[in-house]
Amino acid sequence: MANRTVKEAKNVHGTNPQYLIEKIIRSRIYDSKYWKEQCFALTAELLVDKAMELRFVGGVYGGNIKPTQFLCLTLKMLQIQPEKDIVVEFIKNEEFKYVRALGAFYLRLTGAALDCYKYLEPLYIDNRKLRRQNRAGQFEIVYMDEYIDELLRNDRVCDIILPRIQKRSILEENNEIEPKVSVLDEDLDDELPSDEEKADETNRPKENSTAVRRPRRVRSKSRSRSRERERRSGQGNSARSRDYYDELEDYDRQRNRVRNRDTHNEDYDRRQNNGRHDRERERQDRDSIRERERDGDRDRRDRERERERDRGRHDQRERDSRGERDRRRY
């Protein structure tokens, strides 16, 4: 009874919401200790408190397929089917990043393509780190924007097969969604000169050609800005899309540089820790070898003493038996 979907729940993608998770994983969740103890009789209000306690994301791990707490709460949300406003508040929550990750994962499972692009794409500006548990049970670092990109592009996330959604380009061609605008557009608008500044430059009296001559680099920069203005004003959605992808490449390169620096620092710390662990392990090995040698010497001494006692008892019995024979003879 506790594992049934609520009566007022609606079908999602033509099926029971809980069936969006494969049966084998669903059965493992029902049998898990966290589901039985922490997810029993949860409501939408109480589920918020449980989501705030999350410390990592992930699917299943281990040889016997153990579900993570993140996956248990996802199934609970599919079971009680909270209102869309609650899910949107999960996604807009900036204080608890794992609450946002849980809401984004649930919306990707149950939401339409338009809702997924509408509510998940703004999260590309979130560069916070998330801990994710892999199938081996080990933790790895993933960034929030990378996690959101996986939800929108990959077929499987956190060991769950995601429903298919329409590509963004198709929705743009059908005018169902506005072309994506990069967050860098505002910076580009600030760098471009306004019409008034352009008019002032035009009306300014000409001076000596050698004095007003600017470097070639500056002219090319102004010329590129002019071409950019003309392209932005004269072209349609396709041009804006191309601009966005160019800016996205620049953003990815900058993000990769930051990540490479973080990875280098983490590798350095890991090498330092490994060196300390190796020295500690060598010291423990030396101590264990000395302990085994002391134990071996102690055992040898005990065996020698035992043999001496046995030899003494044997000699005593021989003397006693010889004396007894002598008494019988006389």
UniProtKB/Swiss-Prot annotation:
It comes from the Eukaryota. The keyword Nucleus applies. Its main location: nucleus. Residues 213-224 have a biased composition (Basic residues). Residues 240-330 have a biased composition (Basic and acidic residues). Keywords: mRNA processing, mRNA splicing, Nucleus, Spliceosome. Residues 184-199 have a biased composition (Acidic residues). One of its GO terms (cellular component) is precatalytic spliceosome. Detected in all germal and follicle cells. Residues 182-330 are annotated as: Disordered. Pfam families: PRP38, PRP38_assoc. It is found in: Nucleus. GO terms for biological process: mRNA splicing, via spliceosome; regulation of G2/M transition of mitotic cell cycle. The keyword Nucleus applies. Required for pre-mRNA splicing. Belongs to the PRP38 family. Component of the spliceosome C complex. Interacts with Mfap1 (via C-terminus). This is Pre-mRNA-splicing factor 38. It comes from Drosophila melanogaster (Fruit fly).
